[in-house]
């Protein structure tokens, strides 16, 4: 909801298909990861583009329409060991650090006009009572 205004200004369609799920992760950490990823997607999507948030095969994903140049910047943020890459904001550095600290698997897939970021959140084992 925090990004609705910016998304409206840029005519970006946001489709949130996330459902309530239990995960074994500090809610504050999860909120920080998601808010930074969504903020980045809104800021770097093409005018009139889209952002789609959902789950697929146990992975949470955020997909957004963006240029190849923006995809390069995003990839550099996650492949450099420090915050050296030009154009990589503090938000993505924080996301990478949190994901690695929490040992959360992540990857992304690129295409000509969009990027999809995936992360595998630790699930609560329903049989561990």
Question: Which positions does each model-derived feature cover?
Answer:
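Short helix-loop "hinge" at the ATP-lid/N-box region of the Bergerat-fold HATPase_c
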Residues: 41-42
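Conserved glycine-/histidine-rich ATP-lid loop and adjacent helix of the Bergerat-fold HATPase_c
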Residues: 94-103
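Conserved micro-motifs of the catalytic ATP-binding
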Residues: 22-29
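Glycine-rich phosphate-binding loop
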Residues: 85-94
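Glycine-rich ATP-binding loops of the HATPase_c
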Residues: 102-111
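Short conserved segments within the C-terminal catalytic ATPase subdomain
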Residues: 6-15
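Glycine-rich/acidic phosphate-handling loop/turn and adjacent ATP-lid/helix
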Residues: 61-85
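Short beta-strand/loop element within the Bergerat-fold HATPase_c
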Residues: 48-58
